[in-house]
UniProtKB/Swiss-Prot annotation:
Residues that bind L-aspartate: 85, 168, 230
Pathway it works in: Pyrimidine metabolism; UMP biosynthesis via de novo pathway; (S)-dihydroorotate from bicarbonate: step 2/3
Protein's name in the database: Aspartate carbamoyltransferase catalytic subunit
Molecular function per GO: amino acid binding; aspartate carbamoyltransferase activity
Name of encoding gene: pyrB
E.C. code: 2.1.3.2
Record carries keyword Transferase: yes
Classification via PANTHER family: ASPARTATE CARBAMOYLTRANSFERASE, ORNITHINE CARBAMOYLTRANSFERASE, MITOCHONDRIAL
Keywords noted in UniProt: Pyrimidine biosynthesis, Transferase
Amino acid sequence: MINPLYRKHIISINDMSSNELELVLNIAAHLKFKPQPELLKNKVIASCFFEASTRTRLSFETAIHRLGASVVGFSDAHSTSLSKKGETLADTISVISTYVDAIIIRHPHEGAARLATEFSGTVPILNAGDGANQHPTQTLLDLFNIYETQGKLNNLRIAMVGDLKYGRTVHSLTQALIKFDSNHFYFIAPDTLGMPSYILHTLIDHDIKYSMHLNLAEVIPELDILYMTRVQKERLDPTEYINVKAQFVLQIHHLLHARANMRILHPLPRVDEIAYEVDQTPYAYYFQQAGNGVFTRQALLALVLNKYLTE
């Protein structure tokens, strides 16, 4: 049986069915407990980061090495012909695709990853974040952690806190969880950084419950997952950043009435939105979350490059 993700571009979480999402999570769980150090032996994968990244890039490159593949690429767009010589993204991808078996791309411009698919031929493109648009591999690792801690992806109460306007992680995660039944969302953000209307309209179209709040404490007792985000300084003007950066800070006293099963996730980096004392509580799961990113990215690479990998 051919796996449905073989040679598929991974650009948006919306491009994946619930069955495909579950396939990635199942393979990730398998690889976590049964490493396959030669699964991608002799494969070469390009890591093309036109925008700064630490966790995503290192997580992907660790995943590549642990599967036995080789990695080539760059972490600074200013060192490339695209920047120095004016080469187009189309030409860059057209050339790189002749060298490698898959291309991982992060780019500051929305839509860049999908544009890359038009010039990569049969080489799959994996979107590692395009502007404020999508970050599907982060979403997959978020889903993995939710399933690992809650044992399900449906009938959950999930709060998303902080920068919901520019935070591509919360956009992608909400769209992924829409594919599973009976989830209830709580959006906690200042008015200037609320969830985009297109996400809210999608929730309404699917008859999914959501509510908007300005108070973190009032919803914590109801939650299974508390998804914190930082206010993204690089996407705001300085005045707006100063006004909102510390408006929603999770303190240890907020957790006094939390459910025993509740877990705190964060895509990282953290600035000051989670007090360091919270790290020592059983609710904190963001460092385990980051570690699990290696397994979910291993699973995704394994699936797009292995025709018959289904379990």
